[in-house]
From Swiss-Prot:
Heteromultimer composed of small subunits (RfcS) and large subunits (RfcL). CDD domains: AAA, HLD_clamp_RFC. The keyword Nucleotide-binding applies. This is Replication factor C large subunit. HAMAP family: RfcL. It comes from Haloquadratum walsbyi (strain DSM 16790 / HBSQ001). GO terms for molecular function: ATP binding; ATP hydrolysis activity; DNA clamp loader activity. Residues 479-496 have a biased composition (Low complexity). ATP binds at residues 44-51.
Amino acid sequence: MTDWTERYRPTTLSAVRGNNAARDEFIEWAESWDDHHESVVLHGAPGVGKTSAAHALASDMGWETVELNASDQRTSDVIERLAGRAAKNATLAGAVSGTTSTRQLIIMDEADNIHYQYDRGGKQAVTTLLKDANQPIVLIANEYYDMSRGLRNAAQDIEFRDISARSIVPVLRNILRKENIEFEEAALKQIAEVNSGDLRAAIKDLQTTVEGSDRITVDDVKTGGRDRAMGLFSFLDSVLKEDAAEEALQNSYDVDETPDDLLKWVEDKVPLVYDDAELARAYEFLSNADIWTNRVYATDYNYRWWRYATDNLAGGVAAARETQRGGWTRYGGAPYRSTRDSTRDTVVREVAKTGGFSMATARTAVIPFLSAITHLCKPRSLTVGMAAWYELDEAGVSYITGSGETTKKVASIVEDAAERRSEAVEAHAGSAFAETETEEKTNFTGNQDSDVDVQSHKSAESGDDTVRTANTPAEDHAQSGASETASATESASDSDASTDTDADDDDGQAGLSEFM
């Protein structure tokens, strides 16, 4: 299947949506180029139409194009040989005639990323090229101020702003009509809003959602797994096909998945795209990412190691690719069982609803913390309290603790949690599990058959010091709100910090604080 972002790329500037002011300024630059011979930088967020505008302008002006992509090595020799030859040689494509219709538009993508070792000398070569060229040159950048001062001073700049959802919807509507696919208008609006002004991502999500269907509804969008800041398939395209290492790494921060899940996705899908040599290099980076991910668990859930895993699985795998790739890739489903994926989504919703967190916070911060302090259902009393507070079933307890779903241990924990909830209701407590000190010994630590020893009971009565000692790294993670997970963990941190100082607090999170 052809990639819709390529099939429906605008062929004329009048079809470029959402940046009318930038479009008009770009046209003026081109039409007056003979007077100023100045190059131009188109800058703005990914997916707002910068590259499409450059190609559409060339089509409107009757200019040929010479393109130097981020995937090309951009040393001074390469730049002078490829782009310099087109810009300086007046005989190319009949430019000797001096007519504008025979000019060549030189397009250099990702001009803000000319800094890797293989681009050594590239910045100076481009700066020199901009000053001496007698052909129009367009530089394309996501971050204008990541470009060197020399490049910025040598070219005019035009900013492309994020495209509003209102401007994205007509584009999606037009595509579906050409594809003879029926649609609900609300579904298109939802896709446009989810993609936060990124037209390219919206088109990719649209194609993913309607794949194999002749109709798209709101329910299709809701169940399509696209409630992420950046879609997983857009992220995979970024890493495996489109973007340089730095941009791929930045995009990984916008995906609402933990690094260990992203690792599974990239590892599962990279063979669909890379050739043998690229695949060998990519697997080296994935192996490194796996080592860093395992170190998180080997160090009592020290999440600072995740950053190194992400560097390898996103930036490293992107760097292993020799060229950019276009076209459509059928990535297929999740790399792990769909039942597990469904369980995860259910648990995320329950934790978010009960704790008053956002879905993103529950998924990337709270659940990893709960997994750390209840790993393999230990300590049992804490696991029972968690299951009771969040009303988890066996699948939910199994998912968070990493235990087998059908084990007797998990089943007994769920039964005890249900009993705990019943007792709390009967006691008419202001908070479900904020028991008195007397009740705490019976309810929080469990009955005399509990696998927690007498010393653990005493510790629970005095503030659960034993549990704190056993789980210090995870506890510290929740209290510190470490930047490696998310600043949004403050709600979980506040609940934890209140255990000692606000045990009698009667707000909605008191039960969670007590169980922590």
